[in-house]
UniProtKB/Swiss-Prot annotation:
The gene is ZNHIT1. One of its GO terms (cellular component) is nucleus. PANTHER family: ZINC FINGER HIT DOMAIN CONTAINING PROTEIN 1. The lineage of its organism: Eukaryota, Metazoa, Chordata, Craniata, Vertebrata. Plays a role in chromatin remodeling by promoting the incorporation of histone variant H2AZ1/H2A.Z into the genome to regulate gene expression. Promotes SRCAP complex-mediated deposition of histone variant H2AZ1 to lymphoid fate regulator genes, enhancing lymphoid lineage commitment. Recruited to the promoter of the transcriptional activator MYOG at the early stages of muscle differentiation where it mediates binding of histone H2AZ1 to chromatin and induces muscle-specific gene expression. It is found in: Nucleus. This is Zinc finger HIT domain-containing protein 1. It comes from Homo sapiens.
Length: 154
């Protein structure tokens, strides 16, 4: 008989991957880099009214004589958009004196780090074996595994 090939993922869906500390850190760094490279822009649909709802119109009746000319600030914001890295280079902070974004840092903490649950925020004595997140109860572990474990949360 010929053995049927199966996918590695479909063998045991209940089995969780266990990552070591270095793999967890690489994963977090990769996710943070993806967030940094993400092209943030204002919501293009923010000014549009929602369908099916009538929104009240607020007009200034006192200033009916003169109409104010609308500024083209949004046009320049969109046309000359810069990312965070470009703004830092433009400020030339590496040669500036005094504390700035590149040179400011806090001293080491005087007390050890307190572990808090990633789900509810209470003190947590347990750690997830897959991703290293903290949890306090079995209920929080279940919520973590269903919604957060090895997903895009930092």
């Amino acid at each position: 008989m010929v053995e049927k090939k199966t996918s590695v993922r479909s063998q045991d869906p209940g089995q969780r991957r266990v990552l070591d500390r270095a793999a967890r850190q690489r994963r977090i760094n990769r996710q943070l880099e993806a967030l940094e490279n993400d092209n943030f822009q204002d919501d293009p649909h923010a000014g549009l009214p929602q369908l099916g709802k009538r929104l009240p119109q607020f007009d200034d009746d006192a200033d009916t004589g003169k109409k104010k000319k609308k500024t083209r600030g949004d046009h320049f914001k969109l046309r000359f958009r810069k990312n965070f890295q470009a703004l830092l280079e433009e400020q030339n902070l590496s040669v500036a004196e005094g504390p700035n974004y590149l040179t400011a840092c806090a001293g080491p903490p005087s007390r050890p780090q307190r572990p808090f649950c990633a789900v509810c925020g209470f003190p947590s004595p347990y750690t997830c074996v897959s991703c290293g997140a903290r949890y306090c109860t079995v209920r929080c572990l279940g919520t973590h595994q269903e919604t957060r474990c090895l997903k895009w949360t930092v």
